[in-house]
Curated annotation (Swiss-Prot):
GO terms for MF: large ribosomal subunit rRNA binding; structural constituent of ribosome
Similarity annotation: Belongs to the universal ribosomal protein uL14 family.
PROSITE patterns noted in UniProt: RIBOSOMAL_L14
PANTHER family referenced in this protein's UniProt entry, alphabetically: 50S/60S RIBOSOMAL PROTEIN L14/L23 (PTHR11761), LARGE RIBOSOMAL SUBUNIT PROTEIN UL14M (PTHR11761:SF3)
Keywords recorded for this protein, A-Z: Ribonucleoprotein, Ribosomal protein, RNA-binding, rRNA-binding
GO CC annotation, single: cytosolic large ribosomal subunit
Physiological role: Binds to 23S rRNA. Forms part of two intersubunit bridges in the 70S ribosome.
Organism: Acaryochloris marina (strain MBIC 11017)
Keyword Metal-binding: no
Protein's UniProt name: Large ribosomal subunit protein uL14
Gene3D superfamilies registered for this protein in UniProt: Ribosomal protein L14 (2.40.150.20)
Encoding gene, per UniProt annotation: rplN
Subunit relationships: Part of the 50S ribosomal subunit. Forms a cluster with proteins L3 and L19. In the 70S ribosome, L14 and L19 interact and together make contacts with the 16S rRNA in bridges B5 and B8.
Length: 122
């Protein structure tokens, strides 16, 4: 469950390390976002000499949350951290690698490129 002012780790090699959520996209006044939702965030920590700089405003898709995800099969899954992958306006990832596992719900929300780059899909 991601809301305004939530900090997230970045799960790709775009150059950003930490994000601060500014807004959850979708709906007029949407409060919470989960796996597969797009957020607007600002970069709080970044690697030097990379395209993404500190204080940049970026779009990202949530790939892991500490809040458990309940699936239709009755199974629930929970991750150790809140993480996101930076995307461009077309919805494609800005980095070329994705680190750590991602949830299967991303495939249902048409982020297949991120799913194919991920080392593990849970």
């Amino acid at each position: 469950m991601i809301q305004q002012e939530t900090t997230l780790n970045v799960a790709d090699n775009s150059g950003a390390k930490r994000l601060l959520c500014i807004r959850v996209i979708g709906g007029g006044n949407r409060r919470y976002g989960g796996v597969g939702d797009v957020i607007i965030a600002t970069v709080k920590d970044a690697t030097p000499n990379m395209p993404v700089k500190k204080s940049d405003v970026v779009r990202a898709v949530i790939v892991r949350t500490r809040k458990s995800i309940c699936r239709e099969s009755g199974m629930s899954i929970r991750f150790d951290d809140n993480a996101a992958v930076l995307i461009n306006p077309d919805g494609n990832p800005r980095g070329t690698r994705v680190f750590g596992p991602v949830a299967r719900e991303l495939r249902d929300k048409s982020f297949t490129k991120i799913v194919s780059l991920a080392p593990e899909v849970l």
